[in-house]
Amino acid sequence: MKNIILGGGCFWCIEAVFERLKGVINTEVGYSGGKPNPSYESVCNGDGNIEVVKINYDEKQISLLEILILFFKIHDPTSIDKQGEDIGIQYRSIIFYENEEDKILAQNFIEEQQKIFSKKIVTKISRLQTYYKAENYHQHYFINNPDQGYCQAVIAPKLQKIQSD
């Protein structure tokens, strides 16, 4: 089993896509990249942390490359600290890696993707230093709150688009 930690907008959206994916064993939303011991409130108030999803996956069933391809389909890697109406550093596009092999794969992936995108890809690649699990009410948010307004307006259409691709 391997982990990759991705940030690309609201962590509810990213998790909702990946928790349904064959080969993904578990997802967990959290915070990384900022001050120690964050809370949702401190992240929203600019403590430097990014909303991320830790994806635990079986590399025999799904590759990191496949995960990154999907990641780039579900968020805008050319948008600086903004995804849709969500604005702020906590929505930064980032790949946190745990080993050099994953770093190189991510770098090569972005280089190849840049040939396709007309705008500059701003997704950062950074070694994971610290990761903090988010509050329990954020975990598997879409599954637990499918009728919530944000879920219906933002997450559900994203899932429908991915399923139709």
Curated annotation (Swiss-Prot):
Its EC number is 1.8.4.11. It comes from the Bacteria. One of its GO terms (biological process) is protein modification process. One of its GO terms (molecular function) is peptide-methionine (S)-S-oxide reductase activity. InterPro entries: Met_Sox_Rdtase_MsrA_dom, Met_Sox_Rdtase_MsrA_sf. This is Peptide methionine sulfoxide reductase MsrA. The active site is at C10.
